[in-house]
């Protein structure tokens, strides 16, 4: 009721599939018939992005919240995003999540790693109007924190499926250890705390999520972001909490030379070593592969995983 039908279903945004076919209801039914969980993946703020962002935005029907409330929308880096600093935007996202979990027997909601798309996000007017005494970066993180806390409440209050969970899959580095972040990981890479304004450690410590799935998409021994270093660091963040830790693994890198010799020549072996390493670290509850299309059709990878998960 809140958002138009996706163009990926029929080719036209806002057009429903024929014969009242509901793909999500079908997927849930078929997954549960096979003893599989199905969680709905949500990218909370992004409206349109990529090379066709402008034409995709123009093609949105008038019923789209982005068209009904243009003052909620910010153009950034060639894409269009809902402004996280607007309370009505946070409510819209919560309502959208509530609609999913109350009408479908999904087993969870998972947010992807996209929050603020850039440090250059044009929200100066919203920041000024808020009257906040927080510095801009902290204000942005607080906006995301408010959304995470509210969505957690919405999931657990409105879910029709028993045991429905709320999890987030952020990029693999919270903060790099340094002069201003003594508690960060011993890494050198993109950090979501300062670049996306996503304070995942605060979510964990406050119990606002049921699980966290950091995308540790580097190899064991990587000089900038070693897989083992990050696996151990994240395990310490969830220790003593009720938040489960699932490590995201980069199956998409297998066989691709742009990611280096290890991934190009022994990618399946690398995934196997990462699975073995994770299994031996306290407080790691499992691993997730990104993505299924990389598992399907790769018999070696399938066997690598099956041997460990049978």
Question: What do these predicted ranges mean?
Answer:
Residues 197-223, 234-310:
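Substrate-binding cleft of secreted/luminal carbohydrate-active enzymes
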Residues 6-21, 75-94, 132-145, 188, ...:
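The substrate-binding groove and active-site-proximal loops of carbohydrate-active enzymes
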Residues 31, 93, 100, 109-112, ...:
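Conserved, mostly hydrophobic/aromatic
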């Amino acid at each position: 009721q809140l958002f138009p039908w996706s163009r990926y279903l029929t080719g036209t945004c806002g057009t429903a599939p024929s014969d009242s076919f509901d793909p999500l209801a079908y997927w849930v039914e078929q997954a549960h018939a096979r003893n599989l969980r199905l969680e709905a993946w949500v990218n909370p703020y992004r409206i349109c992005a990529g090379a066709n962002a402008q034409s995709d935005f123009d093609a949105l029907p008038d019923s789209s919240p982005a068209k009904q409330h243009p003052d909620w929308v910010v153009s950034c880096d060639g894409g269009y995003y809902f402004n996280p600093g607007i309370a009505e935007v946070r409510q819209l996202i919560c309502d959208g999540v509530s609609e999913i979990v109350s009408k479908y027997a999904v087993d969870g909601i998972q947010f992807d790693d996209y929050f603020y798309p850039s440090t250059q996000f044009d929200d100066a007017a919203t920041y000024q109007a808020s009257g906040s005494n927080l510095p801009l970066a902290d204000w942005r993180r607080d906006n995301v924190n408010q959304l995470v806390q509210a969505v957690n409440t919405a999931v657990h209050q409105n879910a029709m499926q028993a045991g429905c969970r709320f999890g987030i899959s952020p990029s693999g580095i919270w903060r790099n250890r340094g002069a201003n972040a003594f508690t960060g990981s011993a890494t050198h890479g993109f950090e979501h705390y300062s670049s996306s304004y996503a304070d995942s450690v605060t979510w964990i410590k406050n119990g606002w999520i049921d699980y966290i799935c950091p995308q540790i998409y580097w190899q064991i021994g990587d000089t900038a972001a070693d897989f083992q270093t990050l696996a151990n660091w994240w395990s310490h963040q969830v220790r003593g909490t009720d938040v489960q830790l699932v490590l995201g693994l980069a199956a998409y890198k297998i066989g691709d030379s742009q990611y280096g010799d290890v991934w190009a020549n022994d990618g399946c072996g690398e995934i196997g070593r990462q699975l073995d390493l994770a299994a031996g670290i306290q407080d790691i509850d499992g691993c997730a592969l990104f993505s299924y299309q990389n598992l399907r059709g790769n018999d070696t990878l399938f066997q690598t995983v099956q041997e460990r998960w049978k």
